[in-house]
Amino acid sequence: MKAKHTDLEKLEQLYKESGNQLVVLYGRRGCQKEELIKEFCDGKKFFYYRCRQASPEHQLEMMGEEISRQYKVSLSRQTYEEYFARIKSGGPSKLVVIIDEAQFVAKRDTSFMEAVAKLKKHKLYPGPVLIILATSSTVWATQEAAEQFKGAEMKLESLNFLEVVRHFESLPVAEIVRIYGAIGGVPAYLDKWDAAKSFKDNICRLVLTPSGALYGEADAV
């Protein structure tokens, strides 16, 4: 499923603004933020790093390795300030810096958010930059990140009913009403629904079978 047009437009608008911008991009499980980021970055200069659940030291090491690999540079220090000072777009175009699952590093290492704040204020990278802190943790996005970067949150919403109708354009509306009532408008769930199969077959295959893609999903949200 392609990213929602409205979500792409919001990011594109931020990208077009002059100066540096920062957005905390978040949404529930299945919101497909990775797909949105991939589509948005198409044709742009960007640096992407996905954080892991790791110790502060290991996280720092892994991001440094990615910086060195992508930009072919030798880092004199292992600090986030040093890392953000070495990124580059290679031209006048705005650079997009994406730190995915940022809560994993922000919660364990205060120097990361301090470096992000300096990056936004032009104290590390001289060129224009759009910083995207992406996360699947709604709590972190709306509390901790929101406290430091007030007003920067961008929530990825589920599809509304009309958008789901457009997604299943080959199905009768009555059938789509049943689908929407069962799994809502979560993009990842809708992608798993086989429009060629009956409603009953899909529910049995996805929801009721222990090996189904959506089995137990309600408990995991």
What is each stretch, according to the model?
Residues M1-V221:
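Phosphate-binding site recognition
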